[in-house]
Amino acid sequence: MNSDTFRHFYNYHFTENRKLWDSFIVPLSYDQFIQPESYSHGSLRDQIVHLMDVDEVWFCELRGVAPSEALPAADFDDRQVIRARWDNIEQMMRAYLAGLTDEMLDTRPITDPEEDKELIVWQVLLHVANHGTDHRAQLLRLLHDLGVKTQGQDYIFYVYDNL
């Protein structure tokens, strides 16, 4: 793998996040959006806040900066506020990826927390992308349970659409 591969795969990550938001989250009623769930991190809102918080924390660690304080999902009562924060996180991630070089992939830039110090950049990048796929799948399941007709998020379909 090289830095271009990661930029490509993260374009998929961002595209699927946005597709999920625009196609399925925006049309929901407020009550559906915050409906409590016992599955995983809870409501659709809570899942999305978790997904964007994890993206932010890991990319801040890679950049050597402290992440913003994670706010409880209940503090994100407005979808426009969530979308604005998510857009800012995506832009921060894109900026990091734009500067990513092949040489950086095998470095260990994380200094805190202790348990993350031995992680290599490419491992963190794979983890974050995989985490996103996992939580989008969980979101799709919650949407399905609400009766929403969803679609797959297979990487190969992204490839076909971008050949």
Where are these regions (language model features)?
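Short, contiguous alpha-helical
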Residues: 7-26, 30-72, 113-163
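Helix-adjacent hinge/juxtasegments
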Residues: 64-102
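Short alpha-helical interface patches
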Residues: 78-88, 102-105, 121-127, 158-162
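Acidic catalytic patch
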Residues: 98-114
